[in-house]
Curated annotation (Swiss-Prot):
Its EC number is 2.7.1.74, 2.7.1.76, 2.7.1.113. One of its GO terms (biological process) is deoxyribonucleoside monophosphate biosynthetic process. Its main location: nucleus. ATP binds at residues 21-29, 182-186, 234-236. This is Deoxycytidine kinase.
Amino acid sequence: MATPPKRGRLEGRVKKIAVEGNIAAGKSTFVNILKQADEGWEVVPEPVARWCNVQQNSEEDCEELTTSQKSGGNVLQMMYEKPERWSFTFQMYACLSRIRAQLKSIDGKLREAENPVVFFERSVYSDRYIFAANLYESDCMNETEWTIYQDWHDWMNKQFGQSLALDGIIYLRATPEKCLNRIYLRGRDEEQEIPIEYLEKLHYKHESWLQHKTLRTDFEYLQEIPILTLDVNEDFKGKKDRYDHMTEKVKEFLSTL
């Protein structure tokens, strides 16, 4: 069973928290709230823009892109339209882009903070055990692709696990029905054909992992990792009282780590 490796001086001082939850549970809104709540907090959003438009135009972004990332294409839409063809490609690319974003997360702001915290919008663990596993179980990845993905994921974590290991998880818990409604409201073109059955499968896996703790992983330390569950069925976007309440819950959670 894999365990988190020892960290460097700064990495050991920065608390790393993953914000997990179903599609459209409210993660992006939530991490934006956290970013504004404390000067010592930083967030790493999901790189959705790169999945929807792999080719980037800005010089700053292009300097950081690999050849595959400059090739162009909406790999998220391709996956939803033809999952049997593109699920493996998407999951490999999604995890790669997530790792690259999270490895860059310790910037000058965190180096100067007294109690630095970085919040990851999802983690490499939900990449594998929620989303990729669900696609494999739904016959959208074949046995060979799934085996290659797991082998690649294990190797990447051995190389970069020092910077990716978590101190805690915040689970934004919402029903599949509420998530489907939010998908329609936010209007992301690639997601408009997502069926409720897909969200139900993802919800079941999140519940098994973060509520019932019956989902087993290859990372032993995740079995005992502290988890804060926040019920987000009630819409909280634009509601300051809800922002304040959720922020206080997070501060209380961090104080226990």
